[in-house]
Amino acid sequence: HPPVAIEDFFIAEQIEDYYLLFGQLVKYKRADLAIEAFNRLGKPLLVIGEGEMLPQLKRMANDNIRFLGKQPFEQVRHYLAHCKALIFPGVEDFGIVPVEAMASGRPVIAFAAGGALETVAEHTTGLLFREQTPESLISAIESFEQIQSKFSPESIRGHAKDFGRNTFKRNIKQVIDAQLSEV
């Protein structure tokens, strides 16, 4: 997996009352699941990103969902650091955004597939939902609301460091050293 610039993110003193969906708004990222779930829950959701699904998602969304479009990195950092949790409903080979949220000390609520299985440590750095349905996501969010105080921003950030540049460099060096020792 690619290295993530953990040091570019920070832990906020105050968490605000919103969940965050961040990324390209294309079909396979399944933002529609998040929109449907948050329409039913009525909880605040901020959506950062652009893409072919944006017009359809805006038409679907109730007033508790705000679309912020593309944002500069400084704003993205702010929203990541202050959200209750990142919502990650799609399947990615790796998925850098969940690790960026964790680098900000924030839990991730992700679909249990692809890279999220490697990056999200259940009940330590977030929660996984097992079916790619609004109902399954709603259930995970409701569970999160019951236990959110148990998540430690420092522990979450510590876990993110496993995917940082220093770990990446160390792992690459070990692979190269092992190959060179066989020559």
Name what the model sees in each region.
Residues 54-77:
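Nucleotide-activated donor-binding/catalytic signature segment of Leloir-type glycosyltransferases, i.e.
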